[in-house]
Curated annotation (Swiss-Prot):
The lineage of its organism: Archaea, Thermoproteota, Thermoprotei, Sulfolobales, Sulfolobaceae. The active site is at residues 79, 142, 164. This is Pyrrolidone-carboxylate peptidase 1. GO terms for molecular function: pyroglutamyl-peptidase activity. Belongs to the peptidase C15 family. It comes from Saccharolobus solfataricus (strain ATCC 35092 / DSM 1617 / JCM 11322 / P2) (Sulfolobus solfataricus). SUPFAM superfamilies: Pyrrolidone carboxyl peptidase (pyroglutamate aminopeptidase).
């Protein structure tokens, strides 16, 4: 089976995106005997749906996890819900803006992840990785991707979710901005631990069902 990881290319004034670096670091690794496949998404509304839908259909992963940058957040923040809504004052990398349109005209207004994010937050904090539950993935590309990930994962009875990360320390230092950040190594460790926890939790539930 496969774990499918999505990260994003740089966007707006951020010339490096830690989500891309995290996904590239974990790509082709093996976590609890599951192969990790990493894909970098374009920061373009018109392209991400086709990429996500195609990759999930091709790989039929046991878990699909999106990773995105949340400038201004100081902790790793697993997301609880994606909303069927697009609103962006800033355009995407192609200049496209939305002013309140739905992601999926026929879809639900909101979709909850089927990942136990509350327990995941506890696990990360217990392992010395600052984490906090988030109840809003925003209305930009990350929320857009999360909505599609969860919607598509449900079609295959698999797991789907999204985790936001802070800016990485090395880049924050280079641009000399006073902005919350975290070391890239800590974030990579946090995402790897997250995958391990999610897979272990899934296996426990399956074993309980069988017994």
């Amino acid at each position: 089976m496969t774990v499918l990881l999505f990260g994003f290319e740089p966007f707006l004034e951020y010339k490096e995106n830690p989500s891309q670096l995290i996904v590239e670091a974990l790509n082709r690794s093996t976590i609890l005997k599951e192969e990790v496949k990493g894909v970098i998404l374009p920061v373009e509304y018109k392209k991400i749906e086709d990429v996500i839908v195609t990759k999930i259909r091709e790989t039929k992963p046991i878990l699909t996890l999106g990773i995105g940058l949340a400038p201004g957040r100081a902790k790793i923040t697993p997301e609880k819900i994606a909303i069927n809504y697009r609103y962006s004052r800033e355009g995407d990398n192609a200049g496209k803006k939305y002013r309140g349109e739905k992601i999926d005209p026929l879809g639900q207004d909101g979709i909850f992840t089927n990942i136990p994010v509350e327990d995941l937050v506890d696990l990360l904090n217990e392992n010395g990785i600052p984490a906090e539950l988030s109840l809003s993935a925003g209305s930009y590309l990350c929320n857009n991707a999360m909505y599609i990930i969860i919607r598509e994962a449900r079609k295959y009875n698999s797991l789907g979710g999204f985790i936001h990360v802070p800016l990485h320390e090395s880049y924050a230092a280079r641009i000399q901005r006073s902005i919350p950040s975290m070391s890239l190594d800590t974030m990579i460790r946090g995402i790897k631990l997250s995958i391990e926890f999610i897979l272990t939790n899934k296996n426990k539930k399956e074993n309980l069902t069988l017994s």
